[in-house]
């Protein structure tokens, strides 16, 4: 559905975060007199009132009855379509659509194809991979957009001039379904990995996997690039797409610190500023994507050495009094915390874990701690007591020191004291979202930086967003 098709219809926007505001501006630019209603909270309603838009109404009760009055509801990604009020309104005939679907419909050609668009998703690593892809494409001299879930809503860059040659688009599991619903077919879709996350939004693991994979099952990209090492992807059948693989011996894969293409050694990653084996494997994905676009990936591989790592992702802030502080606030699953820990296997580490409780299973994490644990673990947040109880028997057996904190500031003090004069690494890799304590993971990362004695503003920006 294109924006022009909304004209004259009963249209509402649900959500007034950055995505919601981007949708409003895009609709208003194309449909200046279209009547619109925004569903938002009371504080946001006051902000909207200052816009002085006579064709804009505000409601704060997004009930099924209220939503059901509209033909089209443009929904912000963070609002689950599985909420009872959304399902009830849909049953009454309301059509829910996201800004991502509108953008793809605007850019699709007559046959549905969207040339130059690379969509990237995965449970973890998608932001770094998307940014790295944009970096490599720009190094090759191509004007490239870095947009999507990484921090720039697609509707904020609806029609940039001159248009980019390539679009590196990060999509969360909240957005992947929009691609198929738009009727568009991206040139390439890359799926990095899959393990449970956002179960509160999706409802259960099976639905999460289905929604995530809808990018390739319903979006029908011209080329689907998949991780051969992921068991949830390895058997996937996609008859409408050309399927390519990375992380397998015949293609782009990692041996030690060296990237190979088949049996040919291509690039030593020792100087690439991407900590962790998982990040080096994602470099293989980027090079496979570059190759799939018809470019010389082997020649472009060295460009990765000049990539600047993203904030809040295994970000080394610096050292104070013999203690290094690493900000991995983006970590919102136990698997992500394990991957972060693996980067510091030979260091004295105090790990800070815990946050909003989404009901994820921490038993695998606990089993790993029994085999290769950090020196100290500090639990915090709403799920902190649950994690603490799970780890307590291992701590009592002498595998690691275990501490319970009331909040991040308390956790920092406990971690410093536990490391003592010998120093080490304080690693914030919570394995849980920040909801309830912070507005988002960025705010949590900034607070961590501040508590560690660093300027939070100086470490928070993502380089290269938008079209360059």
Curated annotation (Swiss-Prot):
Gene3D superfamilies: Mur ligase, C-terminal domain, Mur-like, catalytic domain, NAD(P)-binding Rossmann-like Domain. Pathway: Cell wall biogenesis; peptidoglycan biosynthesis. It is found in: Cytoplasm. Keywords: ATP-binding, Cell cycle, Cell division, Cell shape, Cell wall biogenesis/degradation, Cytoplasm, Ligase, Nucleotide-binding, Peptidoglycan synthesis. Signal peptide: none annotated. Its EC number is 6.3.2.53. GO terms for cellular component: cytoplasm. ATP binds at residues 122-128. It catalyses: UDP-N-acetyl-alpha-D-muramoyl-L-alanine + L-glutamate + ATP = UDP-N-acetyl-alpha-D-muramoyl-L-alanyl-L-glutamate + ADP + phosphate + H(+). GO terms for biological process: cell division; cell wall organization; peptidoglycan biosynthetic process; regulation of cell shape. It is an enzyme of class 6 (ligase). One of its GO terms (molecular function) is ATP binding. Cell wall formation. Catalyzes the addition of L-glutamate to the nucleotide precursor UDP-N-acetylmuramoyl-L-alanine. Belongs to the MurCDEF family. MurD2 subfamily. This is UDP-N-acetylmuramoyl-L-alanine--L-glutamate ligase. It comes from Xanthomonas axonopodis pv. citri (strain 306).
